[in-house]
Each structure stands twice: as C-alpha cells, then as structure tokens.
Amino acid sequence: MASRALCVGINQFENLPTANWLNGCVNDANDVSALLTSQYGFADGDITILTDAQATKASVMAALSELKERGTRGEIDRLVFSLSSHGTQIPDLNGDEEVDQADEAFAMYDIQQAGDAWDVGSVIVDDELHALFTGLPKGLLVEVVLDTCHSGSGLRALDFLPGRRPRFIPPPTSDGLDSVETADPVGLRDLIKGSPSGRAPVLFAACRPDQTASDAHFAGRYNGAFTYYLVQALKADPAQSRSRLLSEVSKGLRSGKFAQRAQLEAPAGAKMHAFGQAW
C-alpha cells in the first residue's frame, strides 16, 4: 500500500498577537507523524510536516492538491491529513450554508484581517476542503484528523484552567463577530459526503460543532487534548475499530475533565474497521 500524509501544526501566527498563539499544535503534527511511522507502516519520506511559518495557506493547499492528484492517478491508495490550529468562522462565501450563514475556516500561519472578517486568502474554508475531498477514486482511503474548532459558544470555565487555551479565534472586529455570532455551526459533515463514484473520507474531529477544542498541558509538554488522547489510544491498540477508538478518546477527554466531545464522521462500514483500513 502506497501511503502519504500531510501533518500541519500551527502555534505561531504572523499577524496575530502572541496572546492568540497556541502551544501544542506543532507537537500534534510531530506526534501524528511519529504514530504513522511506528504503527502504520509509513516511512519518513511518506510524510510532509508543515509547521508555523511553513504552513501558509498557499503551501498547505498546494501540498493537499498534489496529494489529491497523486491519488487520482493511482500512485497512492492511503492518505492521512492532520491539522492542528485555530478554527474560526467567516461570512458565507457562496450561499451554501442555509442554516448558519457562515463558513467554517481554519487559520493558517498568514491569517490576516480583511475588513471585518478574516481574509479568505489566509484561511482554509470548509468549502475548499470539501472540493478537494470530492471525486476521489474508490481505491483511495482518506483519513482527516482535525484538532481545531469553529465556535466559541461552548466555552466553559474548564477551558480556562491554567495550561489550557481554546483553539478558536473569533472574527477580528465586533461587527464581524455580529455577522456570525447568531450562526448555528453545523460541523464538517459535508467533508465526508464524497461522491457517488468515490469513497467518502473518514473524519475525526476534536469536538462537536458547538464546542471548543482545548490546547493543553500533558506530562511536561503541550498538545491538543484530542490529539493527545487519540495518539495514546492508537499506541495502546492500533487495530481497534474506529468506533472503539472514538470511545477510548472520549473516555480520555472525560478523565481529563475536558468539556469537548470527540466526533467521528464516516460511512457505517468504515466505523467497524481500524484506523488506516479500507472497508
């Protein structure tokens, strides 16, 4: 099986004050990479890691597009994409968000303001990921791991304990916040719809649409809470089903007193197979 992975982790942001920087995203990217090589047969050369200044929107989209092209040509049959960063919301760009009238987006290193919103040239919008992951061939298995969030509405006191920080950045102005604060985030289910001719991607997400993912301190270092417990669970049992994996990650989050609840969006058959296995 020819495998490739792209692991992205962004702690520092070129145009944001240090108060908005994160601590555990680079560790997340490196930990997912190490997991893939130690447990799932990836070679070091199979994995691209983009962190901080390397992870501009242009570089991440270029890397994803190249991997999609290689998958479409049949050169690879397994692709893992992990992303740890801030999430945010921007006004709906194309009118497809009938419910919440906002697009979910992921902050890249070069995130910058454009009026009352974040510049779409510096964030990756959920619609862009959906376009990338639509029309993939049936022979290509895609697993997406997102340790980020798109809503601040679920913040609780636990999210502000010492050593914890939410992975959410609101719009840059009060008017921008007003434009999306009544939105009802619906999550990223569109990412897994795929197409009739291809296999839908498998999506692991750090939390429910109305919750906040935590950047936290574990045993002397920082990680995303979701990534930390995901990696621990897969090290303990690499062959467990995806459904079982979700249960173990959720158990870990509860034990750590994190309010977020991990999510798995995948076809029914995929949930009964292990991470990295087709169905």
Residue ranges with predicted function:
Residues 1-279:
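Cysteine endopeptidase catalytic domains of the caspase/legumain-like
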